[in-house]
Amino acid sequence: MSQSANDPQFILIAPPTSNRVAFFQQALARLQLSPARVISYLDLLAGRITLPQIMDSNSLLRLESPGKDFAHEQALLELGAQVEEVENYARISVDEVRQLSFEKGRLLWPRQWYLGFRAALRLIEGQLLDCAKGEVMNTPRDIAVMFDKPRCHELLRDHHIRVPRSLGTIRSFEELETQMHDHHCSRVFVKLAHGSSASGVVAYQTNGRQHQATTTVEMMRHNGEWRLYNSRRLRVYRDQHEIAALINELCRHRVHVEQWLPKAGLDGKTFDLRVVVIGGKAYHVVARLSPSPITNLHLLNKRREVEAIQQRMSNAAWQTSMQTCERVMRLFPGSFYAGIDLLITADYQQHAVLEVNAFGDLLPGVWWQGQDSYTAEIKAMLARTSRCSLLARI
């Protein structure tokens, strides 16, 4: 298909080698659209390029995850070291950040990383104010909220979206035990406040005598201190002292703690749903089945089409659950898409929102009306921006 001067130019802010960039470029190619221009966060942070220099009326800006790239992680940690932290969470200096070397799976000061990422988002937001034209798929402000689990949870709760009960601010294992006792809660999820992809997630349960923590986190001692590493292999800790050490270390970087709600079962496993909402409508839905409490697909859990689940639920219950996901996105008016983690209760009749994922739309091999999520987003974005003649051509 020949290109027109008025055709859209997608601009991606992302690590250039990200698989997300590759998948998005493939979707554009399938639609016979021009490849996206890729700008790294590193170039923006260094001032080598600015958005007003490159955006015009045909520009469609998409922010992608800066994750899985050590240079980006290091840059955001360095930026976070320069942000004032009033809550006294763990941090390291700019010089210490520069001395870091890559260690596969290591959790590196996630609170400080978030402060840096939020500062980068604010830089982008400021540059967008100086852009006279162009569209943004998801605004930096919305992304910052989605990446702050306590703040996002509070937003949903305040707008009457059902979420698991929060146990409030926790700064230590001792505080966790006290809060669980006071809330009459024997099972909780402890999550890094700014983690993603099950990073730093602990499913903890106790009856007061016995303790069990299921987690993706491996603990290792180094020079008298704990280092935490993410792993695809789930670990189960039963020693209270080990669990206390794990929780205390996570608390140094800010955590979100919520009640562990029972999930529905299917094929001898429990599951939750990942729902991709695009332009206000629930599109792609996939069930994530796991024998453990943690269902993330990258942990080699099984995915399942949702027809069997729809058959178990009443039509009204299914429609209501999808409508809830669409309601969630109305709380993020600057966001065109997101991935929502949805719990279905054991009786298949109720649901609760577990998380809102700014970059939760990557679901390779999951289709909606013959389209993957990126293709659906591109076509829906073109429709929203009134490029109907282009849609007719593709």
Identify the role of each PLM range.
Residues S2, R122-R254:
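Active-site nucleotide/adenylate-binding loops and adjacent lid/helix of ATP-dependent enzymes
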Residues N6-I11:
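Extreme N-terminal starter segment of soluble prokaryotic enzymes
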Residues P15-A27, L31, A36-I170, E174-E175:
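Conserved N-proximal alpha/beta basic substrate-recognition cap immediately N-terminal to
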Residues T17-N19, K68, H194-S197, P262-K263, ...:
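Short, solvent-exposed loop/turn segments at secondary-structure junctions
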Residues V188, H256, Y283-H284, A352-L354:
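Protein kinase-like catalytic core scaffold
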Residues N207-R327, V366-G370:
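ATP-dependent carboxylate/phosphate-activation module, predominantly the ATP-grasp catalytic core
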Residues R274, D341-L343:
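Short, surface-exposed charged micro-motifs
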Residues L297-Y337, I344-I394:
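C-terminal active-site "lid" helix and adjoining low-complexity regulatory extension at the edge
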